[in-house]
Amino acid sequence: MTQDKPESAAASALAVMERHLHALNGLRENDLADTLHFPHFRLVGTTLDRWPSAETYLSDFRARAGDNWARTAWQTIDVQRESADKVHLAVRINRFDINDQLIADFDSLWIITFKNGKWAAQFRSSFAA
């Protein structure tokens, strides 16, 4: 999916995050993959995860989130810095179980970039358990 480079990088990054959340909660793998650049990276503690392609991303998420996971919500998203082709977002993430009980609450830094004709998440660093 090729997108025009918009006037506001921050607005584009926030739109990526909205699409990512809806695709994740709907378990729509193709839509989710469209919100990520590959290879995609995630730093948790000192462990760097790398997904070279979309094929294993969603199954890996299910393993990370646990069997109790039912949905994710962004508690807050704040633009930290933006340039014409990169945006840093500070995100507070909540995960909920099927009874809508909070099962995870953590901060994450997302880096959304415009490359290969589209805005998508390239990297994130999370303080997840």
Task: Please state what every model-predicted region is.
Residues M1-F38, E55:
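Short, low-complexity N-terminal intrinsically disordered segments enriched in polar/charged residues
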Residues H20, L32, R42, K86-F96:
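Short, well-ordered beta-strand segments in beta-rich or mixed alpha/beta enzyme
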Residues E29-R81:
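A solvent-exposed, acidic/Ser-Thr-rich amphipathic alpha-helical stretch
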Residues L36-H37, I93-R95, S125-S126:
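Short beta-strand segments enriched in hydrophobic/aromatic residues
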Residues W74-Q80, R92-R95, D107-T113:
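Hydrophobic/aromatic beta-strand elements that line small-molecule binding cavities or substrate pockets
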Residues V79-V87, T113-K118:
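A short, structured loop/turn motif at beta-sheet edges
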Residues I103-A129:
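Short beta-strand edge/turn micro-motifs at domain boundaries
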